[in-house]
Amino acid sequence: MTHIRWLFSTNHKDIGTLYLIFGAWAGMVGTALSILIRAELSQPGTLLGDDQIFNVIVTAHAFVMIFFMVMPIMIGGFGNWLVPLMLGAPDMAFPRMNNMSFWLLPPSLLLLLASAGVEAGAGTGWTVYPPLAGNLAHTGASVDLTIFSLHLAGVSSILGAVNFITTIFNMKPPTMTQYQTPLFVWSVLITAVLLLLSLPVLAAAITMLLTDRNLNTSFFDPAGGGDPILYQHLFWFFGHPEVYILILPGFGIISHVVAYYAGKKEPFGYMGMVWAMMAIGLLGFIVWAHHMFTVGMDVDTRAYFTSATMIIAIPTGVKVFSWLATLHGGKIVWHTPMLWALGFIFLFTVGGLTGIVLSNSSLDIILHDTYYVVAHFHYVLSMGAVFAIMAGFVHWFPLFTGYTLNETWAKAHFIIMFAGVNLTFFPQHFLGLAGMPRRYSDYPDAYTTWNIISSIGSTVSLIAVMLFMFILWEAFSAKRKAIATDLLNTNLEWLHGCPPPYHTYEEPAFVQTNFKK
């Protein structure tokens, strides 16, 4: 019966667990690819042999980490597990569609890995720009397999988004208004709306690329009246909301973790937090061309995209200062999730500041496609999204499993990881300012020192990842039972114990909503 339970599951907790395991596995693959990248760049000269294989590894690293690690863990894992529990819903709105959303991902990952294994692989970068992604520069099936992989991952995400939106709107208790749902639920809702609106545009772009490659159309070929810049507009209209999709659930997680370990019953400025996330979601759709400052846009177009991009810093600042205000006056408990959350707040802010630098179109002309950009988005992803995932995972691990992690090991893991990621990515700001371009497998000797330091940092991060695997093994091996949790009134997910029973809220939940002052 076990294989039936896991293959045909319609239970949000089981599907959430599948997502978490799949995401962890993909995370290992993505980490391995990143170690190969840093090994190649650890000294001048070549290690892997040629630029194509290097670019295939870079492309696969990006796709695996985005579509098969961060999104499945944050939206599929945490979303499935927590949204029904926080709402008091018996399950997701469409349980079988939920199962399909998950099972589209392994074939998608298989297609992506297959694309690297046939012909010369897809060495296009994750943006898959034509003409490099066209059938002259990339003959063979590699790019086509990548496109099919993205189609499957996209369908999976769209179905998941529909499911979450329906669940959050329709499956609340009758007396609960939208403004009484927890911030994590809000973050998943806004993320789902972004997915629903942006992914079809990506699907259109890569389908046109597919027909350009195979059916002799010329959407992106100037010889037939097309324009490669059209592809960039379509891709980034998806690509920019996508980066907010990656971080928004993290915002929700951090709000919960900070409030919990500061001993507060709610985060500071609930409504401000909600509206800030909505503002970020909306603004995320009208800034896409800041990725294209170097393609030759009008000065007034550049001025608009610079200003609009800077505006996003305002709601982001609202969130950062609200987290700090939540800490204020609290009885702070220095458990591991709190360390991850504080690391998130600091490092995400650093990444945000370099984002403000890059939003200036005139500066971006110089910094575009240099390691400054790599440093920027790895600060918000490798230290934003990943730190949020770690904060949430360590915080809710007793809920998911009924066991507790070893606090000492978990703190050591945080310290090693913190050192590793900063050592890896901080020097890349210097490389970028010195003009080292991205996506090259070799570099002039002048860049050697910072690259060596960056590669040492990646090895430290690898040790941290391996230590985390050990910590997980230790927890399941020692089987320390989780006993009690604090603040049950405002943290509904813990209500049924650790772990909760297979079915929760089989009868509608009673929710007291008239909070007396």
UniProtKB/Swiss-Prot annotation:
Molecular function per GO: cytochrome-c oxidase activity; heme binding; metal ion binding
Gene3D superfamilies, per database record: Cytochrome c oxidase-like, subunit I domain
Binding site for Fe(II)-heme a: H61, H378
Segments crossing the lipid bilayer: 12-40, 51-86, 95-117, 141-170, 183-212, 228-261, 270-286, 299-327, 336-357, 371-400, 407-433, 447-478
UniProt subcellular location: Mitochondrion inner membrane
Cofactor(s) the protein requires to work: heme; Cu cation
Keyword field: Calcium, Copper, Electron transport, Heme, Iron, Magnesium, Membrane, Metal-binding, Mitochondrion, Mitochondrion inner membrane, Respiratory chain, Sodium, Translocase, Transmembrane, Transmembrane helix, Transport
Catalytic activity, EC: 7.1.1.9
The protein's enzyme class: translocase
Family to which this protein belongs: Belongs to the heme-copper respiratory oxidase family.
Quaternary structure and partners: Component of the cytochrome c oxidase (complex IV, CIV), a multisubunit enzyme composed of 14 subunits. The complex is composed of a catalytic core of 3 subunits MT-CO1, MT-CO2 and MT-CO3, encoded in the mitochondrial DNA, and 11 supernumerary subunits COX4I, COX5A, COX5B, COX6A, COX6B, COX6C, COX7A, COX7B, COX7C, COX8 and NDUFA4, which are encoded in the nuclear genome.
Official protein name in the record: Cytochrome c oxidase subunit 1
Native organism: Petromyzon marinus
Gene: MT-CO1
